[in-house]
Amino acid sequence: MLLPWLNEELIEAGCDEAGRGCLAGAVYAAAVILPKDFENELLNDSKQLSEKQRYALREVIERDAVAWAVGIVSPEEIDKINILNASFLAMHRAVDRLKTRPQHLLIDGNRFKKYPDIPHTTVIKGDGKYLSIAAASILAKTYRDDYMNKLHQEFPCYDWEHNKGYPTKKHRAAIAGHGTTPYHRMTFNLLGDGQLELFSK
C-alpha cells in the first residue's frame, strides 16, 4: 500500500509529470491534494497500470480529491528553456491552478525548482510510494495521452496514438521520411543516429 502523506498536519499536494522523454508534444504535470483518509488499493504508479485502469482511477481522483490541477508546457517552451526546466514549470503551473493552497509539495524525482513560499520534498520513485504523487502521475499521463491522441488525428503517420511521442523506431522513421511537425521538440535528437544535423539542413 502507498503512504497517504509525509506530514499529517500539513495540506500536501503530490506532483508528477508526463512526457519528459518524448520527441514530440507538450510536457504535462499534475498536482493533487487528497483527503487524509483517502484509500484505493488500485492506485499505484501509472506506468504499472493498464490504460483502462488509469482512466477509471482518473474519475475517482477527480471526484474525491480535495483539489487537483494540470499544468502544460508547450514544445516551443521546452526548446527555449530545456526539458528539465519545462518539467518544473509544468508542475508550478499545476500548483498555480489548485483551488486549495497546499502547505507542502511532494515531488516525484530528485530535483525541483522551489515553488514560491511553499516548501517541498523530492521523493525518488515517489509515484510508487505516496498516494498523492501516484494520483498526480495518473492525471498527468491520461491528460497528456488525450492530447497526443488528438494530435495523431492531425498527423497520423507518426503513430502518436500508440507511441504518445516517445522515440520508437516507427516514430523516428516517420520523422526521417516526412520531416518534423510544429509539435516536435527541435532541440531533441529526433533521429537518434547522429544524423539530425544533416537532416535539418
From Swiss-Prot:
Primary site of residence: cytoplasm
Reaction equation(s) it catalyzes: Endonucleolytic cleavage to 5'-phosphomonoester
GO terms of biological process kind: DNA replication, removal of RNA primer; mismatch repair
Membrane-spanning intervals of the chain: none
Single GO molecular function: manganese ion binding
Listed cofactors: Mn(2+); Mg(2+)
Domain RNase H type-2: 10-200
Cofactor-binding details, from the entry: Manganese or magnesium. Binds 1 divalent metal ion per monomer in the absence of substrate. May bind a second metal ion after substrate binding.
Enzyme Commission no: 3.1.26.4
Highest taxon listed in the record's lineage: Bacteria
A GO cellular component entry from the record: cytoplasm
Similarity remark: Belongs to the RNase HII family.
Functional description taken from the UniProt entry: Endonuclease that specifically degrades the RNA of RNA-DNA hybrids.
PANTHER family: RIBONUCLEASE H2 SUBUNIT A, RIBONUCLEASE HII
Protein name: Ribonuclease HII
Species this chain originates from: Bacteroides fragilis (strain ATCC 25285 / DSM 2151 / CCUG 4856 / JCM 11019 / LMG 10263 / NCTC 9343 / Onslow / VPI 2553 / EN-2)
Lineage: Bacteria, Pseudomonadati, Bacteroidota, Bacteroidia, Bacteroidales
